[in-house]
C-alpha cells in the first residue's frame, strides 16, 4: 500500500466482542488499526491474537484508553499525532449495560416477547445507570471532540457510533425527551444534556416509571438515544464527514451471556461497511442489517 493512501482507524473498547471483530475486519482490509481498551493487559492479549492467528502484525497496534478519563483521551490524541499525523476512521464502540444480567435465557425470552419479570433477567441501579451514561454517551462525546481535529486532516473522515435499536425514538416513552430528540432542526448538545440530567434526577428519586422513562435496560436505552441524537448533530456540523449510528444486531457477546443470534463476524459487517465509506456515502443515518431505518 502506498504511504499516501494508507488509512488509520481507532476502535474503542476493542479487546473483545464487536470491537475486536471490527479491528480484525478493518486490519484485514489494509487499514492501520489502533485497538484501544481500558485494560492494558487484555488489550495487548487481543493484539497478540490478531498478530498470531490472523497474521495482521503490520496492521494493528495497541494503545490504552479509558473513555471516561480526559487525561487518557489526551494521551491517545498525542500518540496519534506522533504516530500517524491524522485519523481517517473513528469507531466508538466502548459501552456498558447499565445493569447486571443474571439470566441470559430470561433475557432471550423477554426479547422474544414473553411476559418476563425484569428482576428475573437482572437488576439495574442508579449508580450503574450513571456509569452507563458516562461511558456510552459522554465518553463517546469526549473521544470524538478530541479527535475531530485529526479527522479533519483526512480526505475521507468517518465516524461510526455503535448504537442499538433500543435507542430508537419509538422506544423513548417520555414524550418530552422524544420530542426534543426528534427535533433535529433545533437539536443541540445542550438539549441532550438537559434530557439526560432530567432523566438522572428522576432515576435518583426512583420516579422513572411515573415520569414515563424506560424502565427495562433503562440507562442503556437512554444512552443510545442520546448517542443517536449526537450522531445527527455532528453530521450536520461536519457535512464533509461521514457520521452514522449503527446497530450491529443481537450479537453473541459477554454483554448478553452469548445469547445473541448473530456471530461477531455477522455483527460487524455493517459497522465495517460504514467505516470504509469514501467520499459519496451517507451521513447522519441509522443503519442496521446494511440498511437505513428511521431514528
Task: List where the protein language model places each region.
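The beta1-alpha1 cofactor-binding region of Rossmann-like NAD(H)/NADP(H)-dependent oxidoreductases
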Residues: 40-41, 64-78, 126, 137-140
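Hydrophobic/aromatic anchor residues within beta-strands of the central parallel beta-sheet
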Residues: 60-62, 243
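N-terminal Rossmann-like NAD(P) cofactor-binding module of classical short-chain dehydrogenase/reductase
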Residues: 10, 34, 88-91, 160
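Canonical Rossmann dinucleotide-binding motif of NAD(H)/NADP(H)-dependent dehydrogenases/reductases
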Residues: 2-37
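Catalytic loop of short-chain dehydrogenase/reductase
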Residues: 96-133, 152-236, 247
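Hydrophobic positions on the long internal alpha-helix
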Residues: 91, 139, 143-147, 151, ...
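C-terminal helical subdomain
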Residues: 142, 225, 245-253, 257-295
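Hydrophobic structural elements of the Rossmann-like NAD(P)H-binding subdomain
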Residues: 91, 160, 243-246, 256
Amino acid at each position: 500500500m502506498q504511504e499516501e493512501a494508507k488509512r488509520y482507524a481507532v476502535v474503542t473498547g476493542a479487546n473483545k466482542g464487536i470491537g475486536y471483530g471490527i479491528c480484525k475486519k478493518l486490519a484485514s482490509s489494509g487499514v492501520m488499526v489502533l485497538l484501544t481498551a481500558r485494560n492494558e493487559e487484555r488489550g495487548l492479549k487481543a493484539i497478540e491474537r490478531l498478530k498470531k492467528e490472523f497474521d495482521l502484525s503490520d496492521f494493528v497496534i495497541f494503545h490504552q484508553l479509558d473513555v471516561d478519563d480526559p487525561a487518557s483521551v489526551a494521551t491517545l490524541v498525542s500518540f496519534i499525532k506522533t504516530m500517524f499525523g491524522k485519523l481517517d476512521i473513528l469507531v466508538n464502540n466502548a459501552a456498558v449495560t447499565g445493569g447486571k444480567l443474571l439470566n441470559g435465557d430470561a433475557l432471550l425470552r423477554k426479547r422474544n416477547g414473553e411476559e418476563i419479570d425484569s428482576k428475573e433477567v437482572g437488576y439495574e441501579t442508579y449508580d450503574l445507570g450513571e456509569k452507563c451514561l458516562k461511558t456510552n454517551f459522554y465518553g463517546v462525546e469526549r473521544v470524538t471532540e478530541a479527535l475531530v481535529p485529526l479527522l479533519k486532516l483526512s480526505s475521507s473522515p468517518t465516524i461510526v457510533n455503535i448504537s442499538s435499536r433500543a435507542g430508537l425514538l419509538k422506544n423513548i416513552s417520555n414524550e418530552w425527551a422524544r420530542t426534543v430528540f426528534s427535533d433535529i432542526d433545533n437539536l443541540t448538545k445542550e438539549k441532550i444534556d438537559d434530557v439526560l440530567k432530567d432523566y438522572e434526577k428522576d432515576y435518583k428519586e426512583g420516579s422513572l416509571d411515573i415520569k414515563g422513562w424506560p424502565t427495562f435496560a433503562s440507562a442503556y436505552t437512554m444512552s443510545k438515544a442520546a448517542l443517536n441524537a449526537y450522531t445527527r448533530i455532528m453530521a450536520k456540523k461536519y457535512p464533509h464527514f461521514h457520521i452514522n449510528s449503527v446497530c450491529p444486531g443481537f450479537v453473541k457477546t459477554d454483554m448478553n451471556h452469548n445469547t445473541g443470534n448473530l456471530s461477531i463476524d455477522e455483527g460487524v459487517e455493517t459497522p465495517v461497511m460504514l467505516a470504509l465509506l469514501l467520499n459519496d456515502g451517507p451521513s447522519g443515518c441509522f443503519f442496521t442489517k446494511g440498511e437505513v431505518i428511521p431514528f
